[in-house]
C-alpha cells in the first residue's frame, strides 16, 4: 500500500548543489552583461536594518517578513498579506523588480548603492540584499523568494552585476585618465586628468606616447647603470605628437608612477591670452570704461580717442612750437594771471603789488622833430629814485637772480640819457617770456612799414643801460601813479619826493628791438602815438620836415576828473575806492609816474636837447591826452569791456 500510495505522490527533483551547475552560472553571467538576465520571484518586502553587511542581518530580515505574513494570514484568514509575484531583472546598471501582472516597477536599485547580498541558510529559495536608501540615508534590506531557482543562483547573478559594474567603472577611469591621490593627514585629495571621453584617434596617440615614455625610461635606466645618473629632463628627446607635447615634468612623474596617464597639453599658440575685440587698442589701456569709478564723458571714450589719434585734424595755421615750459614759467604765468593790472577799471582799490621797472612794449618815437607826449612833459630833474610802474610780473622765472645792489637806484639821470632805450631793450624779453606766436596781420603790416622807414630814415643807435628789475627801497615804493592829478594846467601843492615818481628825460632816441615774430624793428622818427595806420603811412611817405600836430580824443575820465588812485597826502582828489582806468599794455607810450604836481612844482617847459625846436606846452598836453585816450580805447587783456569807452573833446583856455 505504501508503494501504491507513493506512486501517486509527486516525485521530488533530485537536488543538485549550485556548485555542480556551473553551466547555468555562465549563462547568468552573459545575461547580466547583456541585460537579459531575469528570475521569477516572490517579493516579500523590505525592512530597515542596523548594519550594512552580514548574512545574519539578511536572515533576520527574512524571518521578520515571513512572520508578519503568517500573522496577517492567520488573523484575517485568506485576506492576509501575500507576497507579490514579480520578475527580478539583474544587469550591470542595477536591480529592477517588476510586477508580474500589472508590469509596474516596484523596485529600481542601482548597483552602486548595494552594499551586500547573500542567500539564506535557512531557506534555500530565499535571497536578500542590503542597500542605502537615497532619500532617508538608511540601510534597507529587500527580501525575495525564488520560484524556480535557488537563492544561491540569484546571489551569484547579483555578484556578476557587481563585477560588470566595477569593470565598466575602471574602463571609464582608464579612458578619461583621472587619478586621485588622497592625503589622510590633511583630508584632501588631488585629482589628475579629465573625465572627457577620448576618441579612437586620441587613444592611439596616448598609447604611442606611453610607448615613447617607456622607451625613454628604459634608456634612462640603461644610462644610470652604465654611467653616472643624469637628470630625467636631459634624456634623449622623444618625438611627440604636435597636439600632445610631453614636458619634462610629465616624464619625471612617469618615473614615479608608471601607471599614471599623462595629461594632454594644448600648444603654446592656444595658451596665449587673446582679447575679444582688438579694434581699439585704447581699451586695454588705462582709459578702459570698465576700469573707471566716475562717469565717462563722450570725449573720453576709447573709441573717440582712437579716432582722434588715427585721424588728427590738420591745422591750417602753422604754429612754431615753443620749448617745454618749466615749473618756474608755469608759476610766473599763474602769478601774472592772478595779479590784476592797475589799468583795469573793473579791478578793486589799488594795492601794493610786486612791480617791475618796465617800459612800454613799443618804443617811444620822435615825431618829425617833436618829442612824444611822455618826453615833452618832463619837468623834474631826475635825481630821485625811480618809482616802479605796477604791471603784471612777466619774467620767465620769478625766482631768478636780480641785479646787484648797485642798480637799486638810478641817480642823476641827465636829460640826454637814453632811459627809454634801456627800457625798450628790456621789453622784448618780457614780451617773449611765454612763447613764440604766429605773426598777425598787424605784425606783417608793421614789418612792411618798418622796411619802408628803414629805407628812408637813418637808424639811430645808442648803448642801452642796464634795466632795473629789482624793487626800490621801501621809502621809494609808490602805488600805481596816474599821468595827471586834478585838472589840467592847474597848480597843485608840491608832493614829497618819495611819493611823486620822477619823470622821464626830455628826448630819448630809441634803438631797434625785435618784434614778437623775431623781426627787428628799427627806431624811426615817425609819430605812432594816437594816429591811425593810414596816417602813419602818410607820414612815412610824406614830407618829413613839417612838424605834425595830432588831434586826439580825450577820455571823459581824463577830462572831467583826472584823478587816479595814489596814496599821497597832498592830493585832495585822491579816492582809494576809485577804480583805476584801463591802460593798454602794448601801447606806444606810457607816463611812468608823470603827474600834474610835477608840472606845477617843476619846470613848466620841457628840456629840449639841442637840434630840436621848443614845443608848446598845450600841444604837449594835447598829445599826452591823445596818447592816454589811445591807450584807453584799445581793449585790455584783462577787461573785455574796456573798448566801450566814449571819446570827447575838451579844450581849456
Curated annotation (Swiss-Prot):
It is a peripheral membrane protein. Residues 213-223 have a biased composition (Basic and acidic residues). This is Protein numb homolog. The modification Phosphoserine is found at residues 194, 244, 276, 295, 427, 440, 636. Interacts with SIAH1. Interacts with LNX. Interacts with CDH1. Interacts with TFAP2A and TFAP2B. Interacts with RALBP1 in a complex also containing EPN1 and TFAP2A during interphase and mitosis. Interacts with AAK1. May interact with DUOXA1. Pfam families: NumbF (PF06311), PID (PF00640). GO terms for molecular function: alpha-catenin binding; beta-catenin binding; cadherin binding; phospholipid binding. PANTHER family: NUMB, PROTEIN NUMB HOMOLOG. It is found in: Cell membrane; Endosome membrane.
Amino acid at each position: 500500500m505504501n508503494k501504491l500510495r507513493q506512486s501517486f505522490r509527486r516525485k521530488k527533483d533530485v537536488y543538485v548543489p549550485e556548485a555542480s551547475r556551473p553551466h547555468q552560472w555562465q549563462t547568468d553571467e552573459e545575461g547580466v552583461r547583456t541585460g537579459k538576465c531575469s528570475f521569477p520571484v516572490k517579493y516579500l518586502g523590505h525592512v530597515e536594518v542596523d548594519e550594512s553587511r552580514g548574512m545574519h542581518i539578511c536572515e533576520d530580515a527574512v524571518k521578520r517578513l515571513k512572520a508578519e505574513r503568517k500573522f496577517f494570514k492567520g488573523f484575517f484568514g485568506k485576506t492576509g498579506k501575500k507576497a507579490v509575484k514579480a520578475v527580478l531583472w539583474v544587469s550591470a546598471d542595477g536591480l529592477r523588480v517588476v510586477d508580474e501582472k500589472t508590469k509596474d516597477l516596484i523596485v529600481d536599485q542601482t548597483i552602486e548603492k548595494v552594499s551586500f547580498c547573500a542567500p539564506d541558510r535557512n531557506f534555500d529559495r530565499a535571497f536578500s540584499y542590503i542597500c542605502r536608501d537615497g532619500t532617508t540615508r538608511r540601510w534597507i534590506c529587500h527580501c525575495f523568494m525564488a520560484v524556480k531557482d535557488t537563492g544561491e543562483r540569484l546571489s551569484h547573478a547579483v555578484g556578476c552585476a557587481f563585477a560588470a559594474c566595477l569593470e565598466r567603472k575602471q574602463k571609464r577611469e582608464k579612458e578619461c585618465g583621472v587619478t586621485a591621490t588622497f592625503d589622510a593627514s590633511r583630508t584632501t585629495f588631488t585629482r589628475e586628468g579629465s573625465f572627457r571621453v577620448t576618441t579612437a584617434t586620441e587613444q592611439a596617440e596616448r598609447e604611442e606616447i606611453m610607448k615613447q615614455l617607456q622607451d625613454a625610461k628604459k634608456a634612462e635606466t640603461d644610462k644610470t647603470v652604465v654611467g653616472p645618473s643624469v637628470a630625467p629632463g636631459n634624456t634623449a628627446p622623444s618625438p611627440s605628437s604636435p597636439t600632445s607635447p610631453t614636458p619634462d615634468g610629465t616624464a619625471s612623474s612617469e618615473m614615479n608612477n608608471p601607471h599614471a596617464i599623462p595629461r594632454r597639453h594644448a600648444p603654446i599658440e592656444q595658451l596665449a591670452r587673446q582679447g575679444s575685440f582688438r579694434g581699439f587698442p585704447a581699451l586695454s589701456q588705462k582709459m578702459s570704461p570698465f576700469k573707471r569709478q566716475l562717469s565717462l564723458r563722450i570725449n573720453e571714450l576709447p573709441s573717440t580717442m582712437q579716432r582722434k589719434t588715427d585721424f588728427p585734424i590738420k591745422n591750417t595755421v602753422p604754429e612754431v612750437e615753443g620749448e617745454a615750459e618749466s615749473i618756474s614759467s608755469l608759476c610766473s604765468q599763474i602769478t601774472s594771471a592772478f595779479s590784476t593790472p592797475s589799468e583795469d577799471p573793473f579791478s578793486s582799490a589799488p594795492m601794493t603789488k610786486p612791480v617791475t621797472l618796465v617800459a612800454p612794449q613799443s618804443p617811444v618815437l620822435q615825431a618829425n622833430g617833436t618829442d612824444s607826449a611822455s618826453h615833452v612833459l618832463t619837468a623834474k630833474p631826475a635825481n630821485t629814485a625811480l618809482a616802479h610802474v605796477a604791471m603784471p610780473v612777466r619774467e620767465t622765472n620769478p625766482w631768478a637772480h636780480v641785479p646787484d645792489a648797485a642798480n637799486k637806484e638810478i641817480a642823476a639821470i641827465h636829460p640826454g640819457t637814453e632811459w627809454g632805450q634801456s627800457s625798450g631793450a628790456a621789453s622784448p624779453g618780457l614780451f617773449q617770456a611765454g612763447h613764440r606766436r604766429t605773426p598777425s596781420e598787424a605784425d606783417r603790416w608793421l614789418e612792411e612799414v618798418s622796411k619802408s622807414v628803414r629805407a628812408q630814415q637813418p637808424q639811430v643807435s645808442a648803448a642801452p643801460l642796464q634795466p632795473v628789475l629789482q624793487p626800490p627801497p621801501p621809502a621809494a615804493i609808490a602805488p600805481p601813479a596816474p599821468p595827471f592829478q586834478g585838472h589840467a594846467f592847474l597848480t597843485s601843492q608840491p608832493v614829497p619826493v618819495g611819493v611823486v615818481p620822477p619823470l622821464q628825460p626830455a628826448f630819448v632816441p630809441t634803438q631797434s628791438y625785435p618784434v614778437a615774430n623775431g623781426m627787428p624793428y628799427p627806431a624811426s622818427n615817425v609819430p605812432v602815438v594816437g594816429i591811425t595806420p593810414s596816417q602813419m603811412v602818410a607820414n612815412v611817405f610824406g614830407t618829413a620836415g613839417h612838424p605834425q600836430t595830432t588831434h586826439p580824443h580825450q577820455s571823459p575820465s581824463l577830462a572831467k576828473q583826472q584823478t587816479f588812485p595814489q596814496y599821497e597826502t597832498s592830493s585832495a582828489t585822491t579816492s582809494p575806492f576809485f577804480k583805476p582806468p584801463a591802460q593798454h599794455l602794448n601801447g606806444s607810450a606810457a607816463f611812468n609816474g608823470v603827474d600834474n604836481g610835477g608840472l606845477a612844482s617843476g619846470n613848466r617847459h620841457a628840456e629840449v636837447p639841442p637840434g630840436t625846436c621848443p614845443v608848446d606846452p598845450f600841444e604837449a598836453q594835447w598829445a599826452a591826452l591823445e596818447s592816454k585816450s589811445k591807450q584807453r580805447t584799445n581793449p585790455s587783456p584783462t577787461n573785455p569791456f574796456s573798448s566801450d569807452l566814449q571819446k570827447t573833446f575838451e579844450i581849456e583856455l
